[in-house]
Structures are given as C-alpha cells and as structure tokens.
Amino acid sequence: MISTVSLFWALCVVCIVNMARYFSSLRALLVVLRGCDPLLYQYVDGGGFFTTHGQPNKQMRLVWYIYAQRYRDHHDEEFIRRCERVRRQFLLTSALCGLVVVSLIALMIWH
C-alpha cells in the first residue's frame, strides 16, 4: 500500500517540475517579446525580470497583461501562443500549489 507521505512528496515533486516549466516558458516569452514588441518589453521590465534588482510592480504588469488576456490583440502569432502557454502553466502550477497546501494541512491533521 502506498503511504500518504510518499504521495505528498510525489505531489511536491510534480509541483516543483511544473514551476520550473512555468519559469522556463516565461523566460522564452520574454525573449520573443524583446524581438516583437520592445516597448512592451521595457514596460514589463523584461531585462531585469529574473534579477534581484527587478521591479516587482513592472513584473506584475506582465502577470495582469496575461491574466486579462490582453495579448489576444497583439500582432505576433508566436507571442500569442507563448502567452497562452504561460497562462495555462500558471493556472496549472497555482492549482498544484494549492493542492500541496491542502495536502500538507490534511497530513498535519491526520498524522
């Protein structure tokens, strides 16, 4: 029989792998954005996005841009596809992180 603790750790590993995929897709999106729309790239702090001196308020602009699906009116098809992929991965990763938290609470109650 599979233990609940091992299932919890497997869920954590899946969540971490999906986070890595999300950040990789976000980095690829920023590369495409730099080429197709330099003004938007500067607007969302594309150059400093993954650095310690990045500006979180500018980074949140990209998050809200993707969340509100404002990219649908963009002229570049590859950029639209990348935004869709990042949005789906963000929703999946958020759901998995929520499931990890719920699982952790359940493990604390039952053990």
From Swiss-Prot:
Keyword tRNA-binding among record annotations: no
Pfam family membership, one: UspB
- Family from the record: Belongs to the universal stress protein B family.
Q: How does it sit in the membrane?
A: Multi-pass membrane protein
Q: Mind telling me which InterPro entries this protein's record contains?
A: Universal_stress_protein_B
Full protein name: Universal stress protein B
Domain of life of the native organism: Bacteria
Indicate whether rRNA-binding appears among the record's keywords: no
Subcellular locations according to the entry: Cell inner membrane
Q: Which residues form a coiled coil?
A: none
Query: Where this protein primarily resides, as one coarse class?
Result: membrane
UniProt keyword list: Cell inner membrane, Cell membrane, Membrane, Transmembrane, Transmembrane helix
What Gene Ontology cellular-component terms does the record carry? Answer: plasma membrane
